[in-house]
Amino acid sequence: MAIWFSIGAIAVAFAQSSPARIENPKVQGKNVDRCADIDGVNDCSARGQSKAASRICIAYGYADQVDSHWHASSGVATHYISQYDMHAGEVKGRWESRPSDGVFDWVVCKK
């Protein structure tokens, strides 16, 4: 009995810590732009894409992103804008609708 309980506890712990894949993520009801504003500049490099994916995960209640994939797509999408405080550094940013050339297909998030 104790062995089955231990196996069950391990399975539950693993399930809680394993990454979650979010297909076609949406924020504010819209697809999410692959780019993010960092330091006041639209950044579509790996850094900007990582920031946008991380913010998607946070919006879904996860701690951070592990991986992501996007595809080219024209139209309007939700775009993440980092905000900074002179004393505190980066503070909570905001989401805004903007024209986009690519949106996320999926994001893998971790707790």
Residue locations for each model-derived region?
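Intrinsic disorder/low-complexity segments
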Residues: 3, 14-15
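Secreted/extracellular ectodomain signature
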Residues: 15-111
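Bacterial N-terminal signal peptides
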Residues: 1-9
